[in-house]
Amino acid sequence: MSQSSTTTEIPQEARDRARSLGWEEGLIEIAIEQGHSLQEIWQALRGGVDGVRARQFLSGGGFVRPDPWWMKVPTEWGIRARAADPALGLSIQDLMVGTYGDVPDVWTNRTEIARGSFPATVGEDMGYTIFDKAIVWADCCVPLYEIAIRDRWISATDLDWASLEPLPAEQEKAVCQLMTELSERAYLEGAILSGWLPAISYGYLELKLFLSTVIYDLARHAETFRKRALANGGGLGLQAPTDYSRTVAESRSFVELMATLFVQDSMLLTLYESGDLIAQNPLEREMYRLCARDRQRYMDYQVERMKHFLFKTPERREEQQLYLNRAEAKLVRDWNDPAVSEPLALLLAGDSRRMDEGHRRLRELRKHQVSAYLANLQRTTITRKTLNGRLQDILNA
């Protein structure tokens, strides 16, 4: 036996692996005597080279290539995805071809397997809990993802912060109080959604991608509102009411969460769309416009998801009414908080000496918000049976 074989310490793990592959005793030592390093031997063992091929290799000096079994999996091959619109480039919609575009009603694999790939013999449970397409899916999430990526904006540079001019103290305080509330609501919703994202199984990849853009949008909104509060001689105001936020955070299922958020999301979209009424300068008008554009995408998903869910599970229609009842009650309670209503009324009035006019305009804005909310519900095929009494009073006023 050569000096190299006697001085090279062969790990027991390597011997055990060799034995499991059918290597005869002493074959590792022979390989070392022929000048092969322990690293090369490990590569052969990890590559699955069995004893017969190892002996052939060492006897003849030829290279034995491990069997490329991974090349033989029966996935759909020969795919050449092409951009439907070359101007927009290759989109995720363009990738939904053949079996790769088949989004099943129930995803049964609990691992990180990519849809369309071939499952390994053994895989670890990755903790997913949402496997039903009806719970999360909306076809619009595919194009909405592309739009979200295309329409992304940067608050630091896309808003002209240098254009801000001092406002009267009471107006600046009203703006900052509103910014405090809106920043908190955006932050909380993004945080809650990000906590649910890992529960959605990999089979609904496109939906997960879209929700990732929503979470990013909400983070940008929280950032932008905070910047506005701190950029013009003001500061943050009183913490926003937490009744509604706690209801959101306590949702026990994705279905409950989406129904609960539907109420606030619709109301906030209408508020942002009405930004010209409360903006005190061009920067704020542009801020509300950009936030409304982001919120519209999310609302489109909310509507289509609910519509798809009710179509697939009509027996759960009445359940949604319960969630909406609870959410509306919490929203009304928040709306009645002076820290929420007074700043809006002052901004709508333009002057604290015209607060009666400001409250009148606020009632008009609230009526518009409730009407738009009910219209969004109608798009999902839901008709509210017992709209919250105070919301009904707003409509009737």
Where in the sequence are the language-model features?
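Short, solvent-exposed positions on alpha-helices
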Residues: L205, L209, P282-E286, D300, ...
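Alpha-helical transition-metal enzyme core signature, strongest for iron centers
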Residues: L182-G190, L211-A229, M258-L269, Y288-M306
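Long, hydrophobic, well-ordered secondary-structure blocks that form the structural core
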Residues: E189-A249
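Beta-strand segments within the central parallel beta-sheet cores of soluble alpha/beta enzyme folds
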Residues: T242, R285-R293, E315-L322
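Solenoid-like repeat scaffolds
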Residues: S201, L277-I278
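Terminal targeting/low-complexity segments that flank the catalytic cores of oxidoreductases
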Residues: S2-E206, V255, K312-A397
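Extended amphipathic alpha-helical segments with heptad-repeat/coiled-coil character used for oligomerization
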Residues: S245-R252, Q264, V303-N325
